[in-house]
Amino acid sequence: METTATAVEADLIASLPANFRWGVATSAYQIEGAVDEDGRTPSIWDTYCRTPGMVHNGDNGDVACDHYHRMPEDVALIKDLGVDTYRFSVAWPRVQPRGNGPVNEAGLAF
């Protein structure tokens, strides 16, 4: 008798507690992009990635997944997944561009 992946998945799901929550998470640097927009200042990662020789091919998060401009579409995709939870982060330099002092209202709005 052959066991299919679907049968194994069904058994796994059935073994989870009733209150188990399926979720996804993102990291600001990996998805936000828009590094020079709406008052955001460079983060430690921006600086590190722009240092020659530190990152293969000089790759960086300047555009990333462009979540800053595509958030409604991204949230709709997450909703379509049918998950229960979504955890995310917002780049601190977007909210607190100077590290102290007044907050960036555009960063809070995002």
Outline where the language-model segments fall:
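Non-catalytic accessory regions flanking glycosidase/transglycosidase catalytic cores in CAZymes
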Residues: 1-110
